[in-house]
Amino acid sequence: MMDFELEGQNFVVTGAARGIGLAISRRLTELGASVSGWDLDQDAMSGESLFHHRMRVDVSDEKSVNDAAEATLSHFEIIHGLVANAGVNGPTKPVWEYSLEEWDKVISVDLTGVFLTSRAFLNHFRDQDYGRLLIVASVAGKEGNPGASPYGAAKAGVIGYAKGLARELLPSKITVNCLAPAITETELFEEMSESYIQEKKSRIPMGRFCTTEEIADMAAWVVSPRCSFTTGQIFDLTGGRATY
């Protein structure tokens, strides 16, 4: 168990129904926080008692996000942090086989979704001069992944977005950081070919995939009051794949 608590803290986690988002939500709750879980798939969250609040949200839709933010703020009154995790991987194939519709879906969820959800809470954070924005990016945003170029483009975009936004908010007590995990064994594997998965595993020097629990532990520290002097940073969880 970690040696700090998040008692009395309220967080929004997008893409909270499963995988990384669910693991982060669980860890925050274990540390005493209250979590509003945002996801399109409310059925997947129906059996999870860890959520204090749930919203069906399409993060790529401006009205859906703004309505959910208003309802969440009305419920909690104070939000201490947002974990922007919702994402899609998209098909694994070369760019010349991608349709514009497939490209747009990845960008709208993985990049525009981060903009919309973070913007919805920024004035609240600014009014209280405190907030933690954590974006779940990917090592693909630093190195690119052949077969998933739109995904890499979106994740590179959120890394640049986080660095710029972090500086815009200085010298406030609002921090903006990213996590950049290597491939993690979640339900997104269902969208990937076996050859793609094995090729990505071969690029991890530790010889295994990242776990959702490892990501959740890192996330809990980054969104805590203890992580108070770090902003605009990318925290890698890559098993040695990326060391920069």
Model region roles, listed by residue range:
Residues 2, 89-92, 143, 220, ...:
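Short C-terminal tail/terminal secondary-structure segment
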Residues 93-95, 102-107, 189, 200:
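Substrate-binding pocket helix/loop in short-chain dehydrogenase/reductase
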Residues 96, 143-149, 171-172, 207, ...:
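Active-site loop immediately N-terminal to the catalytic Tyr-X3-Lys motif
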Residues 98, 144-152, 164, 192:
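Active-site loop-to-helix junction immediately N-terminal to the catalytic Tyr of the SDR YXXXK motif
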Residues 118, 154, 162:
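Active-site helix of classical SDR
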Residues 123, 167-171, 228:
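Alpha-helical segment proximal to the catalytic Tyr-Lys
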Residues 138:
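Residue(s) in the substrate-gating loop at a strand-loop-helix junction
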